[in-house]
């Protein structure tokens, strides 16, 4: 069984005439545009350590818990992600992600609250909660995308 040993928290945004190209630019802006993302549910493995640099070759498969949103002219959007690590490094942590086109101020608060609840339900003490978010505003005819992710490898 494979368990990731490293994780990184990222957010980014991108703009294009095409929705998928805007998403690709958001991935590139977040620093994960040259990897093949496999979307996973929201568990951070025990002993998984934060790493500032992704040490994989371009094209590598990388696991990601992420939220994304794409908007058009006149819309606003936000993505947010949070990861809670346990005081006991033998216990797994949790990851929560969300996106919204409405409650832009609440996304980071929401993911933090979900982390707190999930760790409490598991009877785990929280060492720390790390968050990242991306707000976007579409003022032209272009599509704008945002992503917030916890990537693991």
Task: Kindly give the residue locations of the regions a language model identified.
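Helix-coil modules at protein/domain termini and other flexible surface or pore-lining loops
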Residues: 1-153
């Amino acid at each position: 069984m494979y368990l990731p040993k490293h994780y990184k928290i990222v957010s980014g945004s991108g703009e294009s005439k095409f929705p998928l190209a805007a998403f690709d630019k958001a991935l590139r802006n977040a620093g994960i545009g040259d990897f093949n993302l496999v979307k996973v549910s929201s568990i951070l493995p025990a002993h998984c350590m934060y790493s500032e640099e992704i040490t994989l070759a371009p094209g590598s498969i990388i696991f990601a818990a992420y939220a994304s949103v794409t908007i058009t002219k006149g819309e606003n959007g936000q993505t947010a992600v949070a990861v809670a690590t346990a005081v006991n490094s033998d216990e797994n942590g949790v990851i929560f992600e969300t996106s919204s086109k409405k409650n832009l101020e609440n996304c980071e608060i929401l993911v933090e609250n979900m982390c707190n609840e999930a760790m409490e339900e598991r009877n785990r003490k929280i060492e720390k909660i790390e968050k990242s978010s991306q707000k976007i505003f579409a003022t032209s005819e272009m599509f704008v995308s945002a992503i917030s992710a916890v990537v693991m490898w």
